[in-house]
Amino acid sequence: MELASKYNPADVEGKWYQYWLDNKLFSSKPDGREPYTVVIPPPNVTGVLHMGHMLNNTIQDILVRRARMEGKNACWVPGTDHASIATEAKVVNKLAGQGIKKTDLSRDEFLKHAWAWTEEHGGIILKQLRKLGASCDWDRTAFTMDEERSESVIKVFVDLYNKGLIYRGVRMVNWDPKALTALSDEEVIYKEEHSKLYYLRYKVEGDAEGRYAVVATTRPETIMGDTAMCINPNDPKNQWLKGKKVIVPLVNRIIPVIEDDYVDIEFGTGCLKVTPAHDVNDYMLGEKYNLPSIDIFNDNGTLSEAAGLYVGMDRFDVRKQIEQDLQAAGLLEKVEAYTNKVGFSERTNVAIEPKLSMQWFLKMQHFADMALPPVMNDELKFYPAKYKNTYKNWLENIKDWCISRQLWWGHRIPAYFLPEGGYVVAETAEEALKLAQEKTGNTNLKMEDLRQDDDCLDTWFSSWLWPISLFNGINNPNNEEINYYYPTSDLVTGPDIIFFWVARMIMAGYEYKGDMPFKNVYFTGIVRDKLGRKMSKSLGNSPDPLELIDKYGADGVRMGMMLAAPAGNDILFDDALCEQGRNFNNKIWNAFRLVKGWEVADIAQPEYARLATEWFESMLAKTAAEVADLFGKYRLSEALMAVYKLFWDEFSSWYLEMIKPAYGQPIDKATYEKTLGFFDNLLKLLHPFMPFITEELWQHIYDRKEGESLMVQQLNIPTACNEIIVKEFEVVKEVIGGIRTIRLQKNIAQKETLELQVVGVNPVATFNPVITKLCNLSSIEAVENKADGSGSFMVGTTEYAIPLGNLINTEEELAKLEADLKYQEGFLQSVLKKLSNEKFVSKAPANVIDMERKKQADAESKIASLKESIAALKK
């Protein structure tokens, strides 16, 4: 195969991805090797690739490809999530565009539309991941609502219900008035809002003086649900209200004044309106004091008949209207600007409504007790470890999980209501009928007598089983696959779903497998733009990942992402990083073409080449060991940088320059073969990060057989490093740098040979052949005193000199040195003048004076050196 003169990703990426697929190199089956298992965080089935997915899946692919090359049986399982709220909202919007309301359809009719939508739009994101180079076992692709996963979810619900861990009851829940469903606490995001604090007057019933009790509230629209006023019994300013009753403004309902030390004496007036149906804390007070509960809201956030006033109006419109009406009635004392935190639905971004509702809940304390210790004792490791505290805090304050959703798209709750009240829970309708007959003692009950619960389960109730259900470990608990692949190895995810998903998977793992679901969790950061802003459609600062791949190539984009992606820290993404990645691709390509372009001859290996190969062998070993260590610590960005520097700095800038034959001359066979071996190992180190270009070049190093691939080669890079050679060569680099600086300063062409004198013992004599070649030297000799008129430099404690003789124009050089001397002497005088100024010395900070003294010492040193050089030239 001929290698193109320029690297064009489009010619390479599709070709090799198809080759990997055709040869089933991504597929995994249980065997005798150590398994390495990763399950993809399932993206929404109708989603498209964004920068967060790019980062997350690049990291997963790097880990998976590295594991394959370490000889492990790597299994990366892809899949998608049915995303109840998001998908149902999209289907509802699509139907609305056709003039169809969800309420016009039966459940089955709506689900036909939802499945059609899913089949049309679903799976796009997984196809897009292929462009990135994701080496998933595509034959294992799963969907949270496919048959196997659905059976698992229903089986788990029934099991937990039978264990007494799932219950049904009326509780205060977070209600989403747009999605028309309950949400779990974790699906509520609290935002700071610039609100108002309304001071409302509640007349005291039967008060001869006509006094008012004043209540401060941010929600005057809920007064129609007030059933009590509460004061703190220890509040001196409200003692007069004890035992009284007050009248709700506008509503004219008489309600009691109750006492509880829950009330904050300092907030507002110290009087609290109690609305048990619409506030979590009020609900608890209502339970404690047996207060009536009046639900004044419809599910869509409009006021219900129970409100009595403003019926059918939206809650926020009522807030504006009631302010005017209270003002007109003389029942609004004042309004203040107020900043408070308001809960919003994570999915619809609508303010949630605390609402009493009949829902299904999962008791969480049992799970929290199992899931906390393994993380805190590092049996299951978090990277970075700082997230352990976030996890601990949530588990120690856990509340029961509201698992029911008032949606149709999802796993329908397997509860069946009986004609005379009550219900049964079963995996199938047939089992439910049998249970119903047993429970009622009525053997004549038929299927049509039972009504299945209309609600579906929270999406996370299916994805918490993901590491188990992907290997059918719920339906068939001891099958070969679950026993081999579980627990999985690494989970790569964002910290934003640590509660939604990570913690719950750990709980499910211990409940159903008695073991952790994964050994390590790598938390990625949030992808931000270069100004530090979170990427979003509204800001228009989120690039299209596929456009980036078209422009820079998948390897360029992968490298750009990883250069900016330290574990757990937010990444500041800039297209320039992808450009750096593309430039590195070109560097690798050009280096390979250079090596493959050399003529090879069966000649003796020069000493400089032998030294070069010996040195680079140690550099390669040292970096391979460093990279292995960094992978072990999940510091992938640093691992990439280590390989990048090895290739760019050590291999390209130094090694290839050392061994490069003279123009028109061949390279010896031994050095050439060694160099190809180095290239082979460099490609192995780079492959997990940059799979496409490395595969293309690896296929060109030697003739390969059909089906062979770099991605399944074993790393096997020796890690024994000769530290003495490595350290010595760092000195050699400085010596070569010193010689090149003199050439540059004195304007001496590279073709002019130079002599190098080493004053005293030469610490790098071993590398004389390398220095001679790279610096075009005629000789290197150790001397007691350097020649007059030499240019010299220090490396460590050793002085190196180059006799300049006829190589420079003495008059020009003298003029240059004398001009420099004049400048330095003038500079020294200005510093001394400052230091002799007593006012300056007494008032200036110590660090400023130290800086001036350093300037003095530096100038004096330069002056001495310049005078020495001038004297030498005048001899």
Swiss-Prot record:
Biological process (GO), any one: valyl-tRNA aminoacylation
Motif ('KMSKS' region): 534-538
Coiled coil: 805-875
Ranges spanned by the short sequence motif 'HIGH' region, renumbered to the chain: 43-53
Localization per record: Cytoplasm
Comment field on protein domains: ValRS has two distinct active sites: one for aminoacylation and one for editing. The misactivated threonine is translocated from the active site to the editing site.
Protein name (Swiss-Prot/TrEMBL): Valine--tRNA ligase
Organism: Phocaeicola vulgatus (strain ATCC 8482 / DSM 1447 / JCM 5826 / CCUG 4940 / NBRC 14291 / NCTC 11154) (Bacteroides vulgatus)
Gene behind the chain: valS
